[in-house]
Amino acid sequence: MIRSEKEFDYIKIKLASPMRILQWSHRKLPNGQFVGEVQKSETINYRTFKPEMDGLFCERIFGPSKSLECACGKYKRVRYEGLICERCGVELTESRVRRHRMGHINLIYPVTHVWYTNSRPNYIALLLEVEQCEKRLDTGWTEFADLRDIKEKDNKDIPEYPSSEIECRNYLASPKAILNCKEFLKEKSKAKKSNIVNFYDERIKRIKLASLAYFIAEDEIAFYGLHWDLQQYRRCRELGFTGYPLKPHSKSRNRRRNTPKYLLRSTPNYLIGAVLIKRELEKLNLDQEIIKTRNFIMLCSKVLHKEQPFYNFSHWSRKWEYQRIYKLRDQSIKRIRILENLLTTGANPAWMIITILPVIPPALRPMIQLEGGRFATSDLNELYRRIITRNNRLLRLLEIDAPQLIIRNEKRMLQEAVDTLIDNGKRGKIALSASNRPLKSLSDIIKGKHGRFRQNLLGKRVDYSGRSVIVVGPSLKLNQCGLPYEMAIELFQPFIIRELINQGLASNMKVAKNLLQQNEPIINPVLEKVLANHPIFLNRAPTLHRLGIQAFQPIIVQGRAIKLHPLVCSAFNADFDGDQMAVHVPLSLEAQAECYMLMLAPYNFLSPANGEPIIMPSQDMVLGCYYLTVNNINGLLGSNHYFADLNDVILAYNQDQIEIHTSIWVRYKHKISKPSNFIKKIILNDKSYIEYYENIQIRKDENDQIIVQYLQTTTGRVLLNYIIQTTLNLKP
């Protein structure tokens, strides 16, 4: 089999057109027959345990289940590779093609993509400009409609207003319109603010895309009127009008039986639901819409920056109007981003409506036979089965000319089945299996910590790597880490085998592997020799900056946990409450040289973000130093004993003769600056004398020469001083 490896710089994810989906799955056989469409909901034949033809595991569509063997068994040899069986139509090739060959389902009725109709922001609603708010800046058209109502009710002498919308748009620019609007606001001054807010948003708010796609309406009039509303609104938007004709009010319950003929004529059956949304999306001219939206954003900005006066009426009206314009501008900014992305990627907005549904390869949704004749299958097979069943049932209902109510219900069920396949629970109700377990959809497979991206693409398992919990290793050096013995044997196995053969301890690789499996004592010195000159990488996810991966010199430790120096925790953003870290072994000489020259922990002392030290004692280390140097605790074992040097103190502490906080006197050989807080002076028989200070005792001879001097301290302070001197090589 010929494998082609193509180099690429990046991967671009965008909307797939129906023709592209067909290219993924559509194939032509030598006999002229096209395959690729999944027409049956069956998976396998439960008598022969073979995939059903044209089903979800069809060998003719996705490839053979067994390599180089057709479904009917006529051809079973390597010499027939590439041949297509004339009896069953199966191509003789490797079975691994079932991991990438796709199929498709021709949907009888188009459905909307749930990611674009039930998302925030709602992409389709933004493109069609029906996103919860009235899409116009001038409110005069609606106000004039109310003025007529006022005139009819109160019989006031209000001048006549233009009847057509084009005349109205010209009329709005005149000073007369501003005067009449002021009169109107005086009439409405007694009205509540909430009523006016609802009045402004009422007409567009009732156009709900979910109601269109899922056929949700209280009666026939509301159902057809909803689609009529969208068509009229979109037609007026294309002409540049600021409003659209109002939908007739719904009738009372006793008059809702028959749908008016004029509504049926204005909204044909084939222009309802997702078909209508698809037609409106197809009619969008992206270039013109971008220009119109940019101009609208500029107009909103001028009004908000008071460059162009807009509202000269009451304070609360002006405040509310500015809030509405802010909302319109924000939605227009979101809309122009969507339009520019569609234009850049060359995608058509109508591709958000699915007419051809791709079927992923069967190896990615397997069916496994268990003991006892039962089968375990992926949830995707059940979701695909529902779609095919409902799609075929809708086709039969259309063929027999079933009532429209039944057909609409079946279309809604088909829409819900596709929604569940793409993202189960996105629209509210979660589809459950027979055991009341939520079915795993395509979105569930790719998202989250255990999804396809983070688990299999970003977090791939590689050779010469391991993972374990980290624990603190306070006795380690800064460039060291504790590596568990079992992990070291497994990671460095090839290096150990080579060293065993080079030293003559094993004659071949098989003997060396047997020595490793039997855990012979001879392995330990060989392992230490290998680790002496071989660093390792430690990585903690997420790797947010370059210090998330550092090199260390491994030290063999017992147990199964990786020991880490506490000072490097801040660079890894790690703590010891169950965090895990990954171990990687650099194989090439270049990688090992990079470890020693650039990536060792002592060489990463400063933070690359701000240049400040990132290796600093904190938390347990500060508390430990404080506890180690605490004094003024009386009545402890060995208090006020005298010691010749630091070694005597450490020896006494190791023999449990003194405690960590015991107050002791230690001889000090260096010169002490003139002490203060003199207490007393005692003269001895040999004419020498002892001067007592607060923390110092000095014995001098009769010539004032110092014989010996002692400092008062604690065992813990001696230990801290001894460690610092040893580390800095200051100890004599």
Curated annotation (Swiss-Prot):
Keywords: Chloroplast, DNA-directed RNA polymerase, Magnesium, Metal-binding, Nucleotidyltransferase, Plastid, Transcription, Transferase, Zinc
Co-factor: note: Binds 1 Mg(2+) ion per subunit. Binds 1 Zn(2+) ion per subunit.
Pfam families, per the entry: RNA_pol_Rpb1_1, RNA_pol_Rpb1_2, RNA_pol_Rpb1_3
Residues reported to bind Mg(2+): 575, 577, 579
Cofactor names: Mg(2+); Zn(2+)
UniProt signal peptide: none
Catalyzed chemical reaction(s): RNA(n) + a ribonucleoside 5'-triphosphate = RNA(n+1) + diphosphate
Record localization: Plastid, Chloroplast
Binding site for Zn(2+): 70, 72, 85, 88
EC class of the enzyme, as a word: transferase
Gene Ontology biological process terms, A to Z: DNA-templated transcription
Single GO molecular function: magnesium ion binding
A Gene Ontology term for the protein's cellular component: DNA-directed RNA polymerase complex
Catalytic activity, EC: 2.7.7.6
KW Iron (keyword) present: no
InterPro entries named among the record's database cross-references: DNA-dir_RpoC_beta_prime, RNA_pol_asu, RNA_pol_N, RNA_pol_Rpb1_1, RNA_pol_Rpb1_3, RNA_pol_Rpb1_3_sf, RNA_pol_Rpb1_clamp_domain, RNApol_RpoC1
PANTHER family: DNA-DIRECTED RNA POLYMERASE, DNA-DIRECTED RNA POLYMERASE SUBUNIT BETA
Protein family: Belongs to the RNA polymerase beta' chain family. RpoC1 subfamily.
Subunit structure: In plastids the minimal PEP RNA polymerase catalytic core is composed of four subunits: alpha, beta, beta', and beta''. When a (nuclear-encoded) sigma factor is associated with the core the holoenzyme is formed, which can initiate transcription.
Function: DNA-dependent RNA polymerase catalyzes the transcription of DNA into RNA using the four ribonucleoside triphosphates as substrates.
Name of the protein in question: DNA-directed RNA polymerase subunit beta'
